[in-house]
Amino acid sequence: MLSQEFFNSFITIYRPYLKLTEPILEKHNIYYGQWLILRDIAKHQPTTLIEISHRRAIEKPTARKTLKALIENDLITVENSLEDKRQKFLTLTPKGHELYEIVCLDVQKLQQAVVAKTNISQDQMQETINVMNQIHEILLKEAHND
């Protein structure tokens, strides 16, 4: 089935991609899960634990544990909401912002090097991004309907 092959093709690149990015993250003493949440906060700050859990499709306890490590490493700050004391807003610290910028640059260089070794056009990449975003939205909706 073509749909099965379609999904399997994305699953098969995931592990090799992680292996290529691991040295970059290790150099900066950050794990991949921490990086994904740090990047999410950078793109959506201020944000909350619940919003991160929803966007990343991870359980709140998992996100909470990762956030604790990021807080302990002085990469993010937590501020109570003025309207609702139960709600806490997360933002990057200056150290977190600096790390985000450095790791982004290193990862972008890696990604550009990989793409340069292929014959993928800009249009093909954009179409793939569009399709993956559509699928991501559907999967998030399905996951939250359970």
Curated annotation (Swiss-Prot):
Keyword Iron-sulfur: no
Highest taxon, organism lineage: Bacteria
Record keywords, A-Z: DNA-binding, Transcription, Transcription regulation
Gene3D superfamilies the record matches: Winged helix-like DNA-binding domain superfamily/Winged helix DNA-binding domain
Domain HTH marR-type: 1-137
InterPro entries: HTH_MarR-typ (IPR000835), MarR/SlyA-like (IPR039422), Tscrpt_reg_MarR-type_CS (IPR023187), WH-like_DNA-bd_sf (IPR036388), WH_DNA-bd_sf (IPR036390)
Single GO term (MF): DNA-binding transcription factor activity
GO biological process: response to stress
Keyword Zinc-finger: no
Protein name as catalogued: Uncharacterized HTH-type transcriptional regulator SAR2349
Taxonomic source organism: Staphylococcus aureus (strain MRSA252)
